[in-house]
């Protein structure tokens, strides 16, 4: 292809993504667009065509990004090349959204015409605005009896400040308005800018591991051209590779001769390790490198940590392999080996948030068949010691002695809750109970309110989201962003079973709520740990001070069963003998802890 042809083709490329809150019909709309542009035959067409993982289909959410190239013949007679990038809508995956948005020039903003704007819609719109994208509002689900498209249009204008006068009214389920959406993409989304003859610059926005071809990098070409056989360099890591093949997704991977400015496709180059093709990194030519990398790359830092241990200790190496494999596709997963007296060998893993953590656990159990025990999730605390040094703690067991600590800081988040008028009280009560600090409250229209609180992340990590949903009958939507660290009165609470500390059950709690938490946890463990042949005390302690206790009663065999009547001293002798045996057992006895016990430490809501 000569340069003029490249430039002509470039003017017909439109790169866009779809952003929406969970369940507003994003993947369904993507299905309709694939259908309308003839990307899939009827036989291949299935619900959520771009969601490849079983888990995505089951939960009805999008976890990984997907990119497709589509051909569309517009009303002006030209054939346009669309690159549609489907993004996750969940708050844990915002960084995947931000990367896919960086690969686009435009975004379709989908708003449910019955529910209106939700908290994550806002979060994603701000990400799109940060990337200077052209945003096209689409009011979806207009076939619902409860749809109020005019109200929602007004909301889009008032809350986001977008002009919604020519927003497309659509129903992705029934295929209404799809044509209008595609025409708007042609008219309003700008063609990619960039020089095909300049040194190569390509943004990696996702990577995937294939056992035969190594790492497959999903890329968007910003400048220059790339062909098989060329040498490339990763600008963050400085490593060099030779390109084996380049191609596009239609949604199936199809090889092509070259990728040039504006193309969204894939590249393989015998890259063995996914950490060599970091998401957000820039690929350039090794022979004629670009001067500077594309902006916006940042390493994703985990927000939530927890321990993963195999139930069967022989599975340890399989678990390591599973984590290595998942890490290949998931740049934000971090892990390191750790040991626990109670659980043996395992890994301390870092995740972006709770949904991310659940999904990784579920994928390990499903795809690799390993049964797991997970410990309570915790966040990263900054501990300043009396000698002036600051250390970071992501595991409660590593918390230093109270005498050595000067103060502890914990991460705070700014949480935005959008909720119908009737539930404002319930939401405020919940936020207050989680040590929230009230910031602001705004009425979006006559019956929807946006409430902003600053809450410690550790309070959100447990069950904030579940409680929020149940307190508002599922109507609230929620989004959070980290705002920094603040000093708090935090203490480490240990749980003792039979006088032994169980390291995996330790939690870091606020001093004011320690007594309450201790009492609840101890009672819960009493119910969940099976009764032993001997009496087991369950205690919660802060340092050496016991703050709560409960006792699991022993199971007792009736040793008097075969004494019919008879002398009392004979019975007493048997009972004394039994008592001696129990005492001996108690001294050497080990208590098995079921998985539910670890989760009980977290779930404080069903007191």
Swiss-Prot record:
- MF terms per GO, please? GTP binding; GTPase activity; ribosome binding; translation elongation factor activity
Task: Give the keywords, sorted.
Answer: Cell membrane, GTP-binding, Hydrolase, Membrane, Nucleotide-binding, Protein biosynthesis
**Locate the tr-type G domain: which residues?**
11-193
Localization in the cell: Cell membrane
Enumerate the SMART domains for this protein: EFG_C
EC main group: hydrolase
Membrane protein topology class: Peripheral membrane protein
Q: Does the keyword Membrane apply?
A: yes
Catalysis: reaction(s): GTP + H2O = GDP + phosphate + H(+)
Do you know which SUPFAM superfamilies this protein is assigned to?
EF-G C-terminal domain-like (SSF54980), P-loop containing nucleoside triphosphate hydrolases (SSF52540), Translation proteins (SSF50447)
Binding, GTP: 23-28, 140-143
Query: GO:BP terms for this protein?
Result: positive regulation of translation
Q: Which Pfam families match?
A: EFG_C, GTP_EFTU, GTP_EFTU_D2, LepA_C
A GO CC term attached to the entry: plasma membrane
List the InterPro entries: EF-4, EFG_III/V, EFG_V-like, EFTu-like_2, G_TR_CS, LepA_C_sf, LepA_CTD, LepA_IV
This entry's Enzyme Commission designation comes to 3.6.5.n1
Give the matching PANTHER family.
TRANSLATION FACTOR GUF1 HOMOLOG, CHLOROPLASTIC, TRANSLATION FACTOR GUF1-RELATED
- Function according to Swiss-Prot or TrEMBL: Required for accurate and efficient protein synthesis under certain stress conditions. May act as a fidelity factor of the translation reaction, by catalyzing a one-codon backward translocation of tRNAs on improperly translocated ribosomes. Back-translocation proceeds from a post-translocation (POST) complex to a pre-translocation (PRE) complex, thus giving elongation factor G a second chance to translocate the tRNAs correctly. Binds to ribosomes in a GTP-dependent manner.
Q: Which family does it belong to?
A: Belongs to the TRAFAC class translation factor GTPase superfamily. Classic translation factor GTPase family. LepA subfamily.
Which HAMAP family does the entry mention? LepA
List the NCBIfam families hit by this protein, alphabetically.
lepA (TIGR01393), small_GTP (TIGR00231)
Protein name as it appears in the record: Elongation factor 4
The species is: Shouchella clausii (strain KSM-K16)
**Taxon lineage:** Bacteria, Bacillati, Bacillota, Bacilli, Bacillales
């Amino acid at each position: 292809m000569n340069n003029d042809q490249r430039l002509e083709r470039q003017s017909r490329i439109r790169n866009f993504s779809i952003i929406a809150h969970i369940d507003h019909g994003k993947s369904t709309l993507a299905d309709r667009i694939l259908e309308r542009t003839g990307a899939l035959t009827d036989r291949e067409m299935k619900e959520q065509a771009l969601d490849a993982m079983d888990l995505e289909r089951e939960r009805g959410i999008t976890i990984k990004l997907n990119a497709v190239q589509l051909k569309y013949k517009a009303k002006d007679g030209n054939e346009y090349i669309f690159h549609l990038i489907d993004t996750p809508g969940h708050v844990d995956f915002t960084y995947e959204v931000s990367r896919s948005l960086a690969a686009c020039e435009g975004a379709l903003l989908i708003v449910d015409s019955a529910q209106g704007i939700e908290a994550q819609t806002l979060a994603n719109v701000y990400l799109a605005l940060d990337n200077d994208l052209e945003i096209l509002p689409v009011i979806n689900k207009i076939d619902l009896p409860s749809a109020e498209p005019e109200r929602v249009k007004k909301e889009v204008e008032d809350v986001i400040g977008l002009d919604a006068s020519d927003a497309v009214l659509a129903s992705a389920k029934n295929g209404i308005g799809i044509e209008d959406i595609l025409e708007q993409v042609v008219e309003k989304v700008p063609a990619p800018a960039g020089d095909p003859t300049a040194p190569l610059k390509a943004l990696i926005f996702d990577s995937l591991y294939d056992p035969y071809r190594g790492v497959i990098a999903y890329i968007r070409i910003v400048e220059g051209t790339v062909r098989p056989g060329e040498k490339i360099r990763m600008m963050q890591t400085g490593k060099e590779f030779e390109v084996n093949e380049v191609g596009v997704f239609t949604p199936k991977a199809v090889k092509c001769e070259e990728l040039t400015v504006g193309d969204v496709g894939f590249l393989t180059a015998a890259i063995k390790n996914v950490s060599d093709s970091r998401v957000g990194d820039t690929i350039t030519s090794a022979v004629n490198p670009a001067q500077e990398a594309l902006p916006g790359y940042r390493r994703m830092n985990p927000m939530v940590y927890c321990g993963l241990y195999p139930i069967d200790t022989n599975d340890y190496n399989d678990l390591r392999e599973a984590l290595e494999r998942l890490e290949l596709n998931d740049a934000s997963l971090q892990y390191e080996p750790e040991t626990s007296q109670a659980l043996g060998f395992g890994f301390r893993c870092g995740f972006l948030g709770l949904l991310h953590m659940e999904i990784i656990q579920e994928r390990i159990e499903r795809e690799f068949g390993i049964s797991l025990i997970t410990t309570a999730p915790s966040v990263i605390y900054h501990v300043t010691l009396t000698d002036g040094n600051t250390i970071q703690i992501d595991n409660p067991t590593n918390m230093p002695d109270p005498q050595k600590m000067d103060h502890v800081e914990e991460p705070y988040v700014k949480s935005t809750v959008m909720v119908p008028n009737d539930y404002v009280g319930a939401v405020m009560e919940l936020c207050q109970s989680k040590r929230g600090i009230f910031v602001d409250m705004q009425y979006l229209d006559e019956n929807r309110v946006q409430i902003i609180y600053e809450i410690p992340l550790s309070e959100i990590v447990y069950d904030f989201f579940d409680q929020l949903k149940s307190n508002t009958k599922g109507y609230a939507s929620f989004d959070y962003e980290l705002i920094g660290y603040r000093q708090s009165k935090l203490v480490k609470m240990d749980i003792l079973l039979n006088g032994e500390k169980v390291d995996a059950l330790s939690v870091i709690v606020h001093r004011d709520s320690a007594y309450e938490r201790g009492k609840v946890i101890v009672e819960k463990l009493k119910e969940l740990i099976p009764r032993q042949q001997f009496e087991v005390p369950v205690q919660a302690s802060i340092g050496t001070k016991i703050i709560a206790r409960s006792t699991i009663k022993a199971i007792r065999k009736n040793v008097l069963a075969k004494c019919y009547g008879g002398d009392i001293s004979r019975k007493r002798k048997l009972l004394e003998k039994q008592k001696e045996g129990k005492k001996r057992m108690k001294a050497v006895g080990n208590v098995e802890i079921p998985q539910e016990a670890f989760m009980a430490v977290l779930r404080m809501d069903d007191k």
